[in-house]
Each structure stands twice: as structure tokens, then as C-alpha cells.
Amino acid sequence: MAIKLEDKKAIVAEVNEAAKAGLSAVVADARGVTVGAMTGLRKEARAAGVYVKVVRNTLLKRAVEGTQFDVLNDVFKGPTLIAFSNEHPGAAARIFKEFAKGQDKFEIKAAAFEGKFLAANQIDVLASLPTREEGIAQLMSVIQGATSKLARTLAAIRDQKEAAAA
């Protein structure tokens, strides 16, 4: 099915805007995945703030040109599903990784983060990045642990001085 030039320009502009706003991108081959499963994936992605779209490779190459995701140009072969994480970098990788567990035909091709190419076998690195909330919780637990250790140390010093004075 031929796409009109105006429609092609609109697709390129839409994907380019998503690429400029994206923190990371994941590329996959969804050939053979059922429509129902893809609808579920899109719904989950939308809830997580991830932009997902199937785009022709030539249009995709033009859309990511000049962005941090042009390192992915070599994997734009065959049917291409691309996802851009807008809120936290690991969101798209995490969603695609979970989806791939239940779908034999869903194949993650590659990812990009901060202008660096990540092969499919390195997707776990990106997927394991904590969300903003998880990062804040980890930071707070570290601060709380250090604070409580300081309080225990000060209490021990006080007890030592009281014992020495008595």
C-alpha cells in the first residue's frame, strides 16, 4: 500500500518529535505476534509513558537522523517496531523484555541510550535501570541508614562518657 508524500512527512515529523523527547529507544521485530498481544503491549507502553510505533525503515532512518538514536540505523531492517521511553530510560526496555518472555516470535533487535548502541543481549542493562521512584527510595534508604548509624554512634559515645564519669 503506497503512502502519500504528505503522510510520509507527517510520520517522519511525529517520530522525530518522539525521538527528540525520548530518553532511550528500543527496536524490535514483531513479525508473527497477534494483534491482541500487540494491542496489550501498546496499552502497557502508553501507561508507562512509552511511545510505540511500527514504521517503515526508510522513514525511520529519516526520523532519527540528527538525534541520539541514529546509532540504530543499522538495525532498521525488516519489520521494525520502535519504542521511545519518555519518562525514565529503562521503561521501554523493561516492557519489551517482559513482553518477549511470553512471545516466542517477538525479537528485540537493539537499543540506544545517551547516543550509545546496545545490542539485544545488553538490553538487561537498560531494563534494570531503576525508575525515578525506585531511585529516590534507594537514596532515602541509604540516607536513613547513615543517619541511624550516626545516631547509634553518638549514643554509644554518650553512654561511654556517662560510664566514665560515674
UniProtKB/Swiss-Prot annotation:
The keyword Ribonucleoprotein applies. Keywords: Ribonucleoprotein, Ribosomal protein, RNA-binding, rRNA-binding. InterPro entries: Ribosomal_uL10 (IPR001790), Ribosomal_uL10-like_sf (IPR043141), Ribosomal_uL10_bac (IPR022973), Ribosomal_uL10_bac_type (IPR047865), Ribosomal_uL10_CS_bac (IPR002363). CDD domains: Ribosomal_L10. Part of the ribosomal stalk of the 50S ribosomal subunit. The N-terminus interacts with L11 and the large rRNA to form the base of the stalk. The C-terminus forms an elongated spine to which L12 dimers bind in a sequential fashion forming a multimeric L10(L12)X complex. Disulfide bonds: none annotated. This is Large ribosomal subunit protein uL10. The keyword Ion transport does not apply. It comes from Stutzerimonas stutzeri (strain A1501) (Pseudomonas stutzeri). Forms part of the ribosomal stalk, playing a central role in the interaction of the ribosome with GTP-bound translation factors. The lineage of its organism: Bacteria, Pseudomonadati, Pseudomonadota, Gammaproteobacteria, Pseudomonadales. Belongs to the universal ribosomal protein uL10 family. Signal peptide: none annotated. GO terms for molecular function: large ribosomal subunit rRNA binding; structural constituent of ribosome. One of its GO terms (cellular component) is large ribosomal subunit. It comes from the Bacteria. One of its GO terms (biological process) is translation. PROSITE patterns: RIBOSOMAL_L10. Pfam families: Ribosomal_L10.
